[in-house]
Every structure is written in C-alpha cells, then in structure tokens.
C-alpha cells in the first residue's frame, strides 16, 4: 500500500487512535528534563494512561526488530517519528538518502507518515533564540522550495511513507501565514502535520488554520496553551525553550485552545490519522503520568463528542504484568 492511501480509510467508520509523544516524560532537546527517566517507565505509563500508540523518542531502539519487540511488550503501535529535515540546505537526492534509514524504520513498524520539520538554518539555535530571531524564507525562495518539497514527498510516497510537514516555532515554517504559503506552493503529496500549540504560540488561530487546510492534514499534534504564559512569551520575546520551561504548553483541555471546534472540523472532513498528545513540559513540575492520563481522558471525551469513535486499543484497560523488565 502506498502512502497516499488514507491512513484508516476515508469511507470507513469514524474510528481514530490516540497516541502520545515521549516528550511528556523526557525531552531530547533538554537532557535535564527527564533525561534519567528510563524508556520502560515511559512506555509502561503510556499504556497505563490508555494510549494506543507512541511517537519515536531518542531512547527508542532504531533497529526494526528491536523496536517492534519493545513496543509489542507494552501493547503500543508506532504512530510516527520526528525527522530534522535539511531540505532547504540540500538537494532532494541528498535529503532522501539521509532520511531513508528513518523511513525504513517507520515503514517496518507500520507508521504511515514521517513527522518532517525543516530545521535548516539552525532549529536548535532557533528554539533558544528570542522568537523574533528565527530563520525565514525570502519571498523569492518559496516557489523553488515548494517544488523541492513536493519532489521529496513523492519519493517518500513511492517508498511507502507519507510526508507530514510540521510547522514549528524557531523554523522556516512557523506562522499560519507561512503554512498557507507552503500549502499553496506544494503538491498534494505534501501532507500537513497540524499542531494546535505551535499555531497558537506563533500568534495564529488554530481553528481557522485547521479549517483552511483540513484536506491536507495527515497527522495531528494536540497540545494546549496556557494563555498567560503565551502572552508573556510573545510580549517578552522569549525563546521557544524558555517558554516551554515557563509552562506555555499543556495537554488538551487544560488550556485555551478550542479543541472541540478543531476536532469537529477534523471529523466533518473525514480525518482518519492519529491524534497525538505532544505537549512538552518540565516533568519535575508537571507529573508525566498525571498529565498523560489527563490528556487522554480529555482528548478521548472531546473526540467522541465531535463524532469520532475510539479504536478498541484506546478503550483497552492494560495491566502491567511484566516482571523485572
């Protein structure tokens, strides 16, 4: 099956699955945030909280058989995995060769899309600089970049993994307007990873962005935003990471993002991908299992109210019967 086939079938019952990113427990960008938390604890607590899947994190095995064994042990599927793209700085052939091992891992584990963020011109610097200092594409660069990204997405689709482009603070595609521009200069094989929190943090309107690009959305990151921290971050020109440490993000239903409207729009337009709770916080301040449970409970309730039906995996009450794992 090729990556352009709908993730769970546009004409099937409105059944979706909920996953979580391990960033709730451990932040790969900031080792002091959960760096000593073992992978086994992350996965066990994901399942205890009710999740059907996980995205990749830095502690996960990168060999297909080993990763499958550990995910099977906890009854989890692989929803996707982040890739630090460099397409702005590379040609398509070089970028595809660089990402191929990652795509292979995702395909082997059944993930339908890769989380692709273009971190050219220094994402890791960008997320630590004031938000006003992040990299930008010049006006004349958009068309050429769109052609390159479309070519890359077509190569990925032929391989069997779709491209889900992640708009992200501190990168060349950050704001709602830049997402609009990107969608206008790329072909349909370029799917959109819709991230409610990054839209809000950038000064956008997550509901309106979701409505405008619903037919291109193939993967969803569900993060909420604390309004007081958002205002302080934008007024004070904080860096992305400083805002995270101040608590800008939280799980769905615990902030100011209008998730009922977002989910209703996704249901209306036939979305069948994953809903991923991906809300980085300081685990010393926001107890991971507590927030994981809160996020799943809130998102499941709001998704059901919007017309989605949770898969049996999310409804399953998992009991950890392992010994000394």
Curated annotation (Swiss-Prot):
Q: What is the top-level taxon of the source organism?
A: Bacteria
* InterPro entries recorded: IolE/MocC, IolE/XylAMocC-like, Xyl_isomerase-like_sf, Xyl_isomerase-like_TIM-brl
An example Pfam family from this entry, by short name, is AP_endonuc_2
The family database entries (SUPFAM superfamilies) matched by this protein are listed as: Xylose isomerase-like (SSF51658)
Q: Give the family, as the similarity comment puts it.
A: Belongs to the IolE/MocC family.
**Briefly, what is this protein's role?**
Involved in rhizopine (L-3-O-methyl-scyllo-inosamine) catabolism.
- The protein in question is named Rhizopine catabolism protein MocC
Give the encoding gene's name: mocC
